[in-house]
């Protein structure tokens, strides 16, 4: 009775929508032109286009230039009262008129990038289930195991060239965001187009839904993903294997960018696939490239060489090790032995200074676990043999680094004592607090300048406002992956590369 009637009505409505979306001439219909973000030009359609495609009367008669549309978009953007509101406005604009969206981003990168990407994208992920309007990208659930290739074929574009994929387990420094981590692939791919001109139609954001350990999300009725604990171990790896194989089958010319996977998975997954398929991990290789580029810049500013640097990493995860590995490769390329280069990299993790004999170190850290028996330790500090140094200021005194790089997501880890020690040891200390978002940064630029009498060479992971000093306005260098991965992606597409190799990232760092 009523169920049958409802289904019949739904079928009729569906048929009507299909009919509206069809054009007898084979050209796009008015419906398609106005509701497909990649075709819609709004009031910029010319008179002849309006006549040809049946748009007369569907939009106001005034024909607008792109400049006029940009003025309106800027006005509407600035009318939003919060950064999250601005993010939602840009997201809606991308859904409605893609060409205008990218024109707006390109018109003022400094203004719009912190909204479409870090730091605002972090808040957008945390509230994704509450602000989600129109789905973007693909959500591949573990409930579809054995059918991932079939699911990927549902994507309407058949020649996808770039996928940014996350499992949502470690979004920026915010932890497990589940499928709400989709904001990261969306934001990354927006920058591929805005910064490097990669056609948006060949890019696909993907989130792998393997559950979430975020209890707040599991109890939230508006959370759009699976409300179950995460899978792990062989079950997890099998799902990733199926995804990678499905991409190769459905989109054989596609490069995969792994994004925001946890430390325990990021490096093993990269090692598992890097020599088999076209892929890279931006958190490891992209971060490394932009950090090494920052070191090159710092060397130019203080008239030193890369081989003069001794780096202390606050944080010992995949990002830190990625930077160290690329730094070592750079030094080896300049003629230094690998052993000598490794000796210039020191790490502090959640248990203290990493050293030989420290238990339960992951394999990727073993080569950076130095023998510390010959080092001079501060009076009253642990020897480092039986127990590690846990105070960062003590580690600075022992290691005497020329550069400190923060990738720990521990806010204010570079405190006044640490920074003043760096300034005492070095005429111009290199200090890079790279953790995202801004709330997780190891220090603020204004503190770094104040504690070093404006001698510090600073670059940050998230954007900070310029500093007014006695010498004038100081713009804070941003050491963000967005300066690297769009160009690498465009290079992969343009060259038809079948693998992404480390020398691509060293070359990018040197440019």
Predicted feature residues:
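Extreme N-terminal basic, low-complexity initiation segments
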Residues: 2-9
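Adenosine-phosphate binding glycine-rich loop
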Residues: 39-40, 282-286, 302, 429, ...
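Glycine-rich phosphate/diphosphate-binding loop of Rossmann-like nucleotide-binding domains
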Residues: 276-277, 281-403
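N-terminal Rossmann-like NAD(P) cofactor-binding subdomain of oxidoreductases
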Residues: 356, 386, 398, 407-412, ...
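Rossmann-fold NAD(P) dinucleotide-binding segment
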Residues: 391-400, 409-430
């Amino acid at each position: 009775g009523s169920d049958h009637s409802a289904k019949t009505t739904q079928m009729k409505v569906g048929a009507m929508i299909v009919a509206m979306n069809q054009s007898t001439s084979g050209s796009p219909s008015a419906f398609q032109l106005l509701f497909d973000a990649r075709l819609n030009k709004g009031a910029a359609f010319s008179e002849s286009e309006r006549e040809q495609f049946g748009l007369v009367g569907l939009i106001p008669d005034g024909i607008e230039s792109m400049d006029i549309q940009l003025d309106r978009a800027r006005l509407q953007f600035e009318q939003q009262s919060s950064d999250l509101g601005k993010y939602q406005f840009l997201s809606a604009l991308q859904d409605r008129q893609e060409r205008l969206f990218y024109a707006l981003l390109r018109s003022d990168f400094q203004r719009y990038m912190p909204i479409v990407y870090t730091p605002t994208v972090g808040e957008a992920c945390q509230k994704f289930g509450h602000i989600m309007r129109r789905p973007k990208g693909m959500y591949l659930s573990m409930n579809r195991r054995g059918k991932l290739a079939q699911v990927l074929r549902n994507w309407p574009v058949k020649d996808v060239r770039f996928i940014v994929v996350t499992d949502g387990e470690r979004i920026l420094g915010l932890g497990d965001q589940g499928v709400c981590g989709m904001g990261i692939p969306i934001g990354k791919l927006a920058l591929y187009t805005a910064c490097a001109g990669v056609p948006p139609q060949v890019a696909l954001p993907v989130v792998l839904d393997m559950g979430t350990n975020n209890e707040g999300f599991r109890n939230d009725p508006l959370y759009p993903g699976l409300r179950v604990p995460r899978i792990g171990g062989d079950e997890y790896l099998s799902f990733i294997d199926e995804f990678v194989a499905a991409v190769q089958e459905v989109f054989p010319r596609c490069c995969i960018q792994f994004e925001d996977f946890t430390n325990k998975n990021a490096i093993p997954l990269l090692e598992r696939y890097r020599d088999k398929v076209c892929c890279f991990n931006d958190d490891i290789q992209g971060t490394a490239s932009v950090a090494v580029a920052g070191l090159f810049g710092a060397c130019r500013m203080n008239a030193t060489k890369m081989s003069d640097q001794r780096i202390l990493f606050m944080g010992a995860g995949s990002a830190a090790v990625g930077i160290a590995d690329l730094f070592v490769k750079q030094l080896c390329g300049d003629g230094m032995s690998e052993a000598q280069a490794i000796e210039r990299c020191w790490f502090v993790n959640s248990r203290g200074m990493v050293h030989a004999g420290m238990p339960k170190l992951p394999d990727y850290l073993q080569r950076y676990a130095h023998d510390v028996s010959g080092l001079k330790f501060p009076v009253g500090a642990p020897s480092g043999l039986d127990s590690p140094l846990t105070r960062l200021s003590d580690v600075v005194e022992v290691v005497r680094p020329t550069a400190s790089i923060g990738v720990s997501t521990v806010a204010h880890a570079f405190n006044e004592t640490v920074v003043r020690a760096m300034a005492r040891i070095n005429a111009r200390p290199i200090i890079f607090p790279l953790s995202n978002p801004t709330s997780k940064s190891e220090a603020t630029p204004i503190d770094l300048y104040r504690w070093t009498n404006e001698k510090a060479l600073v670059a940050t992971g998230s954007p900070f406002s310029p500093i007014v000093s006695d010498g004038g306005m100081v713009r804070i260098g941003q050491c963000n992956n967005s300066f690297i991965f769009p160009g690498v992606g465009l290079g992969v597409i343009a060259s038809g590369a079948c693998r992404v190799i480390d020398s691509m990232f060293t070359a990018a760092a040197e440019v």
